Amino acid sequence: MDARKEGLLRKPRFSAQPRVGMGLLPFFLACAVYLLVRNADQPPWVNVLLKILPVLYLAGFLGTAHPGGGYRALLQGALLCSAVGDACLVWPEALRYGMAAFGLAHLLYLRAFGLTPLKPGLLLPLLLVSALYFRVLHPHMPPQVVWPLLAYSIVLVAMLWRGLARGGSAHWGALLFVLSDSVLAWNIFTYLVPHGHLLVMTTYYSAQMLITLSAFQNPRLKSH
């Protein structure tokens, strides 16, 4: 196999679908509106609507991906679950419901990313780093969220493992999702990171966009 063919195996390419970039302009606009207009003094339903619009747009945008199939449907389901989680997190008392919704979203992403290639060597380092971070946060957590957050963390790490193994934009989307959740957990359970909300939301929206874009990439060729 020559180097050019080998490169095709390693590097997923975006399908030749027109105006994918232009199709994301409403998403970027919705993100900007939320970040600029969001205000704690507004009625909660206004902030909920502004917050979930970018993610709902991505779910609709996935309808333009060809071919469609199960991968696209799983991503759309994950985005809809994420929108429910986003809405729940507007109210601090609904944190556990938000974790449940996002946990389901990650299970759908996990199913979409699949188990091929397996790359088991990635899993242990990810589990170790996650366990260390959880141990740092643990003394600051209310007792009622310890077990739900532990379960959520395991699902999140599994999603990251499969996203990294899949490669392409899903790789970077999974990484940014974990970064966003890590900063959010620090903000909630320890102390506020400077500009923490901006960091959480920009990494979160970027993560969802990159995972969405993985549906527009050509399937990777496999060698036998």
From Swiss-Prot:
List the coiled-coil residues: none
GO cellular component terms given for this protein: cytoplasm; endoplasmic reticulum membrane; membrane
Membrane topology (Cytoplasmic): 1-19, 66-72, 115-120, 162-171, 217-224
Tell me the GO molecular function terms: alkenylglycerophosphocholine hydrolase activity; D-lysine 5,6-aminomutase activity
Q: So which stretches are on the Extracellular side?
A: 38-44, 92-97, 138-144, 190-197
* Catalysed transformations (reactions): a 1-O-(1Z-alkenyl)-sn-glycero-3-phosphocholine + H2O = a 2,3-saturated aldehyde + sn-glycerol 3-phosphocholine; a 1-O-(1Z-alkenyl)-sn-glycero-3-phosphoethanolamine + H2O = a 2,3-saturated aldehyde + sn-glycero-3-phosphoethanolamine
List the EC numbers from the record.
Answer: 3.3.2.2
| Catalytic class of the enzyme | hydrolase
Stretches that traverse the bilayer: 20-37, 45-65, 73-91, 98-114, 121-137, 145-161, 172-189, 198-216
**Localized where?**
Endoplasmic reticulum membrane; Cytoplasm
Q: Which GO terms describe its biological process?
A: ether lipid metabolic process
Superkingdom of origin: Eukaryota
Q: How is its activity regulated?
A: Competitively inhibited by lysophosphatidic acid.
Keywords from the UniProt entry: Cytoplasm, Endoplasmic reticulum, Hydrolase, Lipid metabolism, Membrane, Transmembrane, Transmembrane helix
- Tell me which InterPro entries the record gives: TMEM86B-like
For membrane topology, the record states: Multi-pass membrane protein
Q: Could you tell me which Pfam families the record lists for this protein?
A: YhhN
Its annotated function is as follows: Catalyzes the hydrolysis of the vinyl ether bond of choline or ethanolamine lysoplasmalogens, forming fatty aldehyde and glycerophosphocholine or glycerophosphoethanolamine, respectively and is specific for the sn-2-deacylated (lyso) form of plasmalogen.
Which family, according to UniProt? Belongs to the TMEM86 family.
Query: How the protein assembles, per its UniProt entry?
Result: Homodimer.
Name of the protein described by the UniProt record:
Lysoplasmalogenase TMEM86B
Gene name? TMEM86B
